Regions:
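Residue-level recognition of short, well-ordered coil/turn positions
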Residues: 15, 200-201, 271, 408-409
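A glycine-/polar-enriched beta->alpha junction
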Residues: 8-18, 25-42, 79-109, 119-137, ...
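Periplasmic alpha-helical coiled-coil/stalk elements that build and connect Gram-negative outer-membrane
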Residues: 137-265, 375, 379
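Amphipathic alpha-helical coiled-coil segments
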Residues: 19-34, 153, 157-178, 189, ...
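Exposed, low-structure sequence patches enriched in small/polar residues
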Residues: 39-40, 44, 48, 293-307, ...
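Bacterial Sec-pathway N-terminal export signals of envelope proteins
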Residues: 1-75, 126, 131-134, 140, ...
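Small/polar, glycine/serine/threonine/aspartate-rich low-complexity segments that form flexible
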Residues: 46-121, 248-256, 301-332
Length: 409
């Protein structure tokens, strides 16, 4: 298993990546549903049975007396409605038709009431269009966040896979180094045994070599155990069987990272900027909504249609009566001891505080990116130094082993 396979294939096929893909698809579907909510919606209503048999208390219109009347009837209703949201004004337009059939069993009489055509429109007098535009901006920003968040989550999964892979690589290098040292020490122990027989070293020196050999054996066993555990963690995360080996890649790392270029791409691809934009838009929407509630406003509703009543279905659609209605409702705050003004000031303060928090968070985020860049540059320098020191230590150990075998140590 190579590093390229782990990052570009196996990590993307893991269960964690599949879960993120499903969540991302849900976010896309939610945004698609929001856009489709502005398309015409066709609704069919059908109520075949509404049966009632009971005694009802009614008041006579002539003398005002009360009497109980038996109600034994079934009411059937059928209707269609087409609804359309108007994004420019924030209102809603409805067009439809209804028919109602009443069967009175006690009187053995049937009747039809129809509404062949009706159209209605309702909206706020002021502010509905702006609220809808703010809502559109918020939903578009949420969709952009969903795309960038998915890419960010996948990158985090790849980062986790990379961390586990490098941990396994480090354990493998430790185990290989432990094997080399153990083999070299076994050779030294054999040479020390020969020198002990020849009287070149004391038994104390030989025991020291034997103790060192046991310590190296202990280190070797731990290194093998850690390597097996790290491999198991890596393969478990990737969701593959533990029957493969990993290869040590050739590290070709850039010595430094351009901070300005990195910050540019982070702002472009990281979802944090869009998340702050959403928060700002929501605070702006909340401020505007509170202003609407605490100032002069109202609602308007316009209705026009045709209705008729008859004992036969054909007559119920003849000579329809025109039905019109206009409803205008005003909300006029007169005097509330300054409560409305204070509510607006509270919302304005929350809006300003949100803007300051966003600026502070973006500044801290840029500093965090710069710190990571500095950490990377410093780590690369340490890695180059450690690589050279490791190569020199191996050469020194080989030279020391050779000197010991020649009796110069």
């Amino acid at each position: 298993v190579t590093l390229d396979e782990v990052i570009n294939r196996l990590s993307l096929e893991s269960s964690s990546a599949k879960i993120e893909l499903l969540n991302f698809q849900n976010d896309l579907l939610q945004y698609e549903n929001y856009k489709k909510s502005f398309l015409p919606a066709f609704v069919l209503n059908f109520n075949p049975i509404n049966f009632n048999r009971s005694l009802r208390l009614l008041q006579q219109p002539i003398d005002g007396s009360y009497s109980y009347v038996e109600d034994n009837s079934n009411n059937t209703n059928f209707g269609t409605t087409v609804r359309q949201k108007i994004s420019i004004t924030g209102g809603e337009l409805s067009i439809g038709s209804n028919i109602n059939y009443l069967n009175e069993f006690s009187r053995k009489q049937n009747s039809f009431s129809t509404n062949p055509f009706f159209i209605s429109y309702s909206q706020q007098l002021w502010g509905g269009g702006k609220l809808q535009r703010l809502e559109n901006k918020i939903e578009r920003a949420k969709n952009e966040v969903a795309v960038k968040q998915y890419c960010s989550n996948i990158a985090q999964i790849q980062q986790q896979a990379l961390t586990l892979y490098l941990s396994a690589i480090l354990s493998k290098m430790d185990s290989e180094l432990a094997i080399d040292i153990k083999q070299s020490n076994d050779t030294l122990l054999h040479i020390a045994e020969i020198k002990l027989r020849n009287g070149s070293i004391t038994e104390y020196d030989y025991k020291q070599m034997e103790l060192q050999s046991l310590n190296l054996q202990y280190m070797y066993e731990n290194a093998v155990k850690h390597y097996a555990e790290s491999i198991q963690k890596l393969f478990t995360f990737l969701g593959i069987e533990n029957n493969a080996e990993i290869t040590i890649p050739d590290f070709d790392l850039p010595l430094t990272i351009d901070a300005r270029l990195a910050i540019y791409y982070v702002k472009k691809n990281n979802p944090i900027s869009n998340q702050q934009e959403i928060q700002q838009l929501e605070e702006e929407k909340n401020l505007f909504s509170i202003k609407l509630k605490n100032r002069f406003n109202g609602n308007i509703s316009l209705n026009y249609g045709i209705n008729q009543y008859a004992e036969t279905l054909a007559d119920a659609y003849r000579h329809g009566n025109t039905r019109q209605s206009v409803i205008i409702e005003f909300q006029i705050p007169i005097f509330q001891w300054g409560i409305n003004k204070n509510n607006i000031r509270i919302a304005k303060n929350n809006y300003d505080a949100s803007r300051l928090r966003i600026e502070k968070k973006m500044f801290e985020f840029e500093n965090e990116v710069r710190e990571k860049i500095n950490t990377y540059d410093h780590s690369v320098k340490l890695w180059l130094t450690a690589s050279r020191a490791y190569a020199l230590s191996k050469e020194q150990y080989k030279m020391l082993t050779k000197k010991f075998s020649l009796g110069k140590v």
